[in-house]
């Protein structure tokens, strides 16, 4: 195994970390209706907590309205309660076997809370990226101890690990900044 192999093993994990962050922030409200807004909602169904996607279909009706088509009519009230209790600031209204979810405009205070939440998710992702860099450096040091690479190669590998970290931290910061702008846009 070489230093390059170690880097090739770590980089996909860093990409996956950014993808996880991207998925996480899609569930943060921005004032516009998106189906991913309800991704974290869990419904008490058939004696267990199930993701909303497994009890109904979510669609965007217009810029400020989501429609949830519940497949089992007996689950409408439980689904409505789950959306209301999800702490998203939404007020669902049942209409037969469907639930209309109006997306109210965000207050300045709520926008700031969502920006903080975005930054928290970003910080968690930064920690994950740094842990991956640490793992890469440890793997490189193990290679040096096993005499598989020279000290110069080890030092270059450490520099490569730092460069990789900076590349992905910059991408992460760009994603955070874009989401903050999206949240704060009125």
Curated annotation (Swiss-Prot):
GO molecular function: ribosomal large subunit binding
PANTHER family the UniProt entry points to: MITOCHONDRIAL RIBOSOME RECYCLING FACTOR PSEUDO 1, RIBOSOME RECYCLING FACTOR
Protein name (record): Ribosome-recycling factor
Keyword Lipid biosynthesis set for record: no
Signal peptide: none
Role, per record: Responsible for the release of ribosomes from messenger RNA at the termination of protein biosynthesis. May increase the efficiency of translation by recycling ribosomes from one round of translation to another.
InterPro entries reported for this sequence: Ribosome_recyc_fac, Ribosome_recyc_fac_dom, RRF_sf
Pfam families: RRF (PF01765)
Subcellular location: Cytoplasm
Keywords noted in UniProt: Cytoplasm, Protein biosynthesis
A biological process from GO: translational termination
Main location: cytoplasm
Gene that encodes it: frr
């Amino acid at each position: 195994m070489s230093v390059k192999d170690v880097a090739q093993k770590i980089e996909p994990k860093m990409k996956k970390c950014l993808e996880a962050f991207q998925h996480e922030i899609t569930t943060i409200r921005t004032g516009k209706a998106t189906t991913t807004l309800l991704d974290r909602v869990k419904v008490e169904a058939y004696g267990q907590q199930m993701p909303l996607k497994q009890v109904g279909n979510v669609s965007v009706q217009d810029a400020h309205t989501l429609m949830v088509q519940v497949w089992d009519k007996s689950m409408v009230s439980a689904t409505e309660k789950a959306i209301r209790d999800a702490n998203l600031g939404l007020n669902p209204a049942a209409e037969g076997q469907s639930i209309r979810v109006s997306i109210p405009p965000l207050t300045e205070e709520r926008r700031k809370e969502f920006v903080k939440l975005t930054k928290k998710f970003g910080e968690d992702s930064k920690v994950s990226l740094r842990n991956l860099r640490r793992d890469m450096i440890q793997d490189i040091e193990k290679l040096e101890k096993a005499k598989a690479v020279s000290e110069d190669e080890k030092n270059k590998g450490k520099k490569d690990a730092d460069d990789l970290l900076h590349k992905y931290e910059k991408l992460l910061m760009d994603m955070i900044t874009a989401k903050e702008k999206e949240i704060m846009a009125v």
